[in-house]
Amino acid sequence: MRHYEVVFIVHPDQSEQVPAMVERYQSLVTGQNGAVHRLEDWGRRQLAYPIQKLVKAHYVCMNIECNQATLDELEHSFRYNDAVLRHLVIKTKKAPVGASIMMKSVEREEARKASAEAAAVQAE
């Protein structure tokens, strides 16, 4: 089986449906003897360019190990899901270890917001 990094962008109005979508895609991969090595929800982020007149969307990254038939079925489900604006599948040499660079920046951003809120509460 081969390793892949899958990133998909979900319509911002469907953000509350993301956990169910991720669960469905995980079960699709694991149900056919695949494995999900890393799953990261990057949250709602600014798009590089407008897609369908939207400037923000919900990003999800999955690192999986599966066969070609499973990957084809996963891409088919992305293509026919109207909530998925874009998706990208990249073949990788091995399973990743640790958090991705994007996830680290998301965590730094959240920590900065939390410290700013704590400072605002202490100032009052």
Swiss-Prot record:
GO molecular function, one term: small ribosomal subunit rRNA binding
Record keywords, A-Z: Ribonucleoprotein, Ribosomal protein, RNA-binding, rRNA-binding
Gene Ontology cellular-component annotations: cytosolic small ribosomal subunit
CDD domains the UniProt entry points to: bS6
Gene Ontology biological process terms in this record: translation
SUPFAM superfamilies reported for this sequence: Ribosomal protein S6 (SSF54995)
Family according to the record: Belongs to the bacterial ribosomal protein bS6 family.
Function: Binds together with bS18 to 16S ribosomal RNA.
Descriptive protein name: Small ribosomal subunit protein bS6
Organism: Bordetella avium (strain 197N)
